[in-house]
């Protein structure tokens, strides 16, 4: 009997970039869902650690229920028994206990991988998601070990006690962070202006068309795209440039579901 090889059963064994995602669930499409979609679109494998459950839609956020520190640590340690991430991306983490636990695990078990932090201090609908304790948690546990953080204008000021952008960046870089991508530094303009600051390289400025309307999960999309590009082996500046182009296109082709905010189309 002759054997005919079924070519449809031949699997692509090229290595996927592995991204460890640490964030909260948002039933309306930001948070972990946005992270997962972005990773899939950019050919990376997302392994997710849940920090909390949010009660929200694109119009309002009414509650965040944090996972216990015990359950959080158990998720991490069990996953890392067999999963070897190339990058870790952190989204909403609304507990200093979880921040401390994550910092310990990263330092002890994953000291060589880049850490991408999207410091979510408010929801897209305007809800406040921080206390002074949370701000201090970022500064003590996460910012010092970050490869890059991606705050918007409001967040970078909150993290630095209300300083102007340049002073805020100097403060955060002095706190240990290697790179800072400050997004939408002039919200009143018709274009979006982002700035990348680094401890070792000159500042870069990026300008993009501002699309009309409000969008849900753009920050999650951008920061996860940065993580994916780093997982693919890009240097930080190339990763940031590529991620911004991707996120901008996802907004350009966003889904208008008739909700308060549009949903970025991550598979445009």
Please name every model-derived segment.
Residues 158, 213-236:
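Short, small-residue alpha-helix embedded
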Residues 43-45, 202-204, 229-243:
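Phosphate-handling active-site elements
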Residues 28-36, 220-223:
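Short glycine/serine/threonine-rich phosphate/pyrophosphate-binding segments
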Residues 66, 237-268:
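Charged C-terminal helix
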Residues 132-203:
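Conserved phosphate/ATP/ADP-binding segment of small-molecule kinases
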Residues 4-20, 34-124, 268:
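Conserved N-terminal subdomain of the carbohydrate kinase-like
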Residues 68-74, 123-143:
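Conserved phosphate-binding/catalytic loop of the ribokinase/pfkB sugar-kinase fold
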Residues 23-27, 203-216:
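Short pre-catalytic strand/loop immediately N-terminal to key active-site residues, enriched for Gly-Thr
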